[in-house]
């Protein structure tokens, strides 16, 4: 956050990525959202489950190599998406929202089906926004 104050530009901000915060062992809940809210430009949702024997790994700046499994955003056992959506509602988030998950998507039909399922999931978690559009 100190760097944001130094940069001090209205078009420069943060992307809130709870899954990556979780991989790094950082809190991603309400306290974090309150701190980041004034600087957030996008919410980027994906879902991971930490697993020492997981098939995917990434080097992190604070925990070294971390192994995990990719999960669909609606699956439990990874990011607490209920808490994330409740927190976004509490801070009044009405900005951009991106969902990322390439795992298991190999065809255009796979992508359309996944996008539709994601849209339904997001609609079920947001209050007053039944107009979420699948592009």
Residue spans for each PLM region:
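Histidine-acidic metal/acid-base catalytic patches
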Residues: 2-12, 16-135
């Amino acid at each position: 956050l100190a760097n944001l104050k130094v940069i001090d530009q209205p078009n420069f901000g943060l992307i809130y990525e709870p899954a990556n915060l979780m991989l790094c062992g950082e809190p991603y809940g309400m306290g974090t959202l309150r701190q980041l809210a004034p600087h957030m430009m996008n919410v980027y949702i994906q879902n991971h489950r930490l697993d020492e024997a997981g098939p995917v790994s990434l080097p992190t700046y604070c925990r070294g190599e971390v192994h995990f499994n990719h999960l669909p955003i609606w699956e439990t056992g990874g990011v607490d998406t209920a808490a994330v959506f409740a927190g976004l509602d509490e801070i009044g988030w009405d900005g951009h929202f991106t969902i990322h998950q390439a795992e298991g998507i190999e065809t255009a039909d796979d992508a359309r089906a996944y996008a539709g399922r994601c849209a339904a999931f997001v609609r079920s978690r947001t209050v007053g926004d039944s107009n979420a559009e699948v592009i």
